[in-house]
Amino acid sequence: MAIVGLGTDIVEIERIQAHVARAGNKLAKRVLTEAELAIYTAHSQPSRYLAKRFAAKEAAAKALGTGIGRGVSFQHIHIGNNEDGAPTIHFTEGALARLQQLKATVGHISIADEKSYAIVTVIIESQ
């Protein structure tokens, strides 16, 4: 396997909290898939959850080489967790098309957060 994409993003959690306080769920509805939005609304720390998902999708779009836009939307990238709690990444629509264009077969994701920041790295591999 070869690495065909690498993306990293960092988000200040307080910036997301301020946006949510100012605009309500507008950002969450733009960034999160329907399944992610359900988790967000029930989460004990929704702004922290949103910050991590925002950073994850930005990192994934960078790894795809497009950024958000140019055919790739926040809605085309889903961040979940496996049965052990480790983060997973799934691509649909424009993000999946770009993944296939890169002849990539798998995406790996690491999410970390501390008091003030969330940081994510995404690696995309081909066979």
Curated annotation (Swiss-Prot):
By sequence similarity, the record places it as follows: Belongs to the P-Pant transferase superfamily. AcpS family.
Query: What this chain does, per the record?
Result: Transfers the 4'-phosphopantetheine moiety from coenzyme A to a Ser of acyl-carrier-protein.
Q: Mind telling me what this protein is named?
A: Holo-[acyl-carrier-protein] synthase
Q: Which gene encodes it?
A: acpS
SUPFAM superfamilies given in the database record: 4'-phosphopantetheinyl transferase
**Protein source organism:** Shewanella baltica (strain OS195)
Question: What keywords sit in the KW lines?
Answer: Cytoplasm, Fatty acid biosynthesis, Fatty acid metabolism, Lipid biosynthesis, Lipid metabolism, Magnesium, Metal-binding, Transferase
Name where it's found. Cytoplasm
One Gene Ontology term of the molecular function aspect: magnesium ion binding
